[in-house]
């Protein structure tokens, strides 16, 4: 191969250098701004071996089955952060058993958080008086639909909440929320 003398090699002019620098800066800023937008459309990865989202307590800590069962009595329904950050009731079914389903606490009428009323043994919406039985089935309107369900699983003492895709056992129909 022959080498070209240095005088024959074209150099990068000041204008070309500034154009390259400007293009690189604008591209970097555009990619930085588009990353969160693109990331929004990518579904979150499943956590844990059983899949789903790790249930979080009111402080944002992951819920463990042993810790939850030691501080909650049988029949208790208490809120955790579930799918998409929605408040979800975990149900204690026995001394050492968390229920296989959770109940989304968002009212199907106007989206209020529905508290559990242990005295009446039902969920009662404070906004417009809708009532749901212990399984989240609507028993009194104006709410048109039952509360959404979520699968609850325990894997290595960690509690996970995942999308409910089975038939709604309360109505025998396909879930309205999936």
From Swiss-Prot:
Cystine connections: 112-127
The protein's GO terms of the molecular function aspect are: 2 iron, 2 sulfur cluster binding; electron transporter, transferring electrons within cytochrome b6/f complex of photosystem II activity; metal ion binding; monooxygenase activity; oxidoreductase activity, acting on paired donors, with incorporation or reduction of molecular oxygen; plastoquinol--plastocyanin reductase activity
Q: Which Pfam families match?
A: Rieske, TM_PetC
Which domain of life does the UniProt lineage start with?
Bacteria
Query: What is a single cellular component term in the Gene Ontology annotation?
Result: plasma membrane-derived thylakoid membrane
What keywords sit in the KW lines?
A: 2Fe-2S, Disulfide bond, Electron transport, Iron, Iron-sulfur, Membrane, Metal-binding, Thylakoid, Translocase, Transmembrane, Transmembrane helix, Transport
Cofactor needs: [2Fe-2S] cluster
Give the catalytic activity.
Answer: 2 oxidized [plastocyanin] + a plastoquinol + 2 H(+)(in) = 2 reduced [plastocyanin] + a plastoquinone + 4 H(+)(out)
Q: What is its EC number?
A: 7.1.1.6
Which positions are annotated as binding [2Fe-2S] cluster? 107, 109, 125, 128
- Protein name stated in the entry: Cytochrome b6-f complex iron-sulfur subunit
Q: Which organism is it from?
A: Synechococcus sp. (strain CC9311)
């Amino acid at each position: 191969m022959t080498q070209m003398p240095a005088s024959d090699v074209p150099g990068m002019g000041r204008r070309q250098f500034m154009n390259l620098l400007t293009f690189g800066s604008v591209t970097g800023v555009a990619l930085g701004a588009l990353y969160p937008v693109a990331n929004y459309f990518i579904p979150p990865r499943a956590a844990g071996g059983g899949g789903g989202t790790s249930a979080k307590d009111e402080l944002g800590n992951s819920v463990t089955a042993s810790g939850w069962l030691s501080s909650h009595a049988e029949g208790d329904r208490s809120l955790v952060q579930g799918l998409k950050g929605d408040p979800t009731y975990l149900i204690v079914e026995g001394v050492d058993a968390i229920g296989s389903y959770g109940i989304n606490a968002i009212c199907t009428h106007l989206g209020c958080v529905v508290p559990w009323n242990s005295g009446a043994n039902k969920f009662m919406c404070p906004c417009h008086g809708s009532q749901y039985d212990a399984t989240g089935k609507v028993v009194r309107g104006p709410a048109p639909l039952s509360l959404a369900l979520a699968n609850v699983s325990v894997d290595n003492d960690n509690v996970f909440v995942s999308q409910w895709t089975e038939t709604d056992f309360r109505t025998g129909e396909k879930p309205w929320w999936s």
